[in-house]
Amino acid sequence: MMQPKKTKFRKAHKGRIHGVASSGATLAFGQFGLKAMEPERVTARQIEAARRALTRHMKRAGRVWIRIFPDVPVSKKPAEVRMGSGKGAPELWVARVKPGRVMFEIDGVNQQTAKEALTLAAAKLPIKTRFVARIAE
C-alpha cells in the first residue's frame, strides 16, 4: 500500500476539495487514461485494488502509471470511545482528487483492452470516471 515515508505533521485537517484540477488534467505518459469526474478522497487501498485490477486484465503487458498519491492522513477514534480527549490516531492515507484529474494511465495495449481494464479499475474507485485517449498524431 502507498503512503509517505515521512511527513511534516502526523495529522491533517479534514478540509474540502474545491475547484477543478489544473495540473494533472491531461495525459502525460500513456496513450489511455482514467479521469475523475467528481471530487472525492481516494484511499490507498482503493488505489491498490484498482492497480491490481488493471494489471491483471492487461496480463502484465504494457505499462501502468499511477498519477495520484495518498499523502493525507485520516485519523479515527477506536470503537466505543467517548467523544473528546483529543483527535484519534492516524488510521489510513487518502489522496484528495479533484474533478478532471487523470488518476491512471496505461500504454502498450490496444484501445479495447485499455478500455476494459480501466473500466474494471473504475469499479474499484468511489468516484465517477471517464476513459480518455490521446489523439493520434
From Swiss-Prot:
GO terms for cellular component: cytosolic large ribosomal subunit. Keywords: Ribonucleoprotein, Ribosomal protein, RNA-binding, rRNA-binding, tRNA-binding. SUPFAM superfamilies: Ribosomal protein L16p/L10e (SSF54686). InterPro entries: Ribosomal_uL16 (IPR047873), Ribosomal_uL16_bact-type (IPR000114), Ribosomal_uL16_CS (IPR020798), Ribosomal_uL16_dom (IPR016180), Ribosomal_uL16_sf (IPR036920). Transmembrane segments: none annotated. One of its GO terms (biological process) is translation. Pfam families: Ribosomal_L16. It comes from the Bacteria. PROSITE patterns: RIBOSOMAL_L16_1, RIBOSOMAL_L16_2. One of its GO terms (molecular function) is tRNA binding. Coiled coil: none annotated. The keyword Ribonucleoprotein applies. PANTHER family: 50S/60S RIBOSOMAL PROTEIN L16 (PTHR12220), LARGE RIBOSOMAL SUBUNIT PROTEIN UL16M (PTHR12220:SF13). Binds 23S rRNA and is also seen to make contacts with the A and possibly P site tRNAs. Part of the 50S ribosomal subunit. Belongs to the universal ribosomal protein uL16 family. This is Large ribosomal subunit protein uL16. It comes from Rhodopseudomonas palustris (strain HaA2). The lineage of its organism: Bacteria, Pseudomonadati, Pseudomonadota, Alphaproteobacteria, Hyphomicrobiales. The gene is rplP.
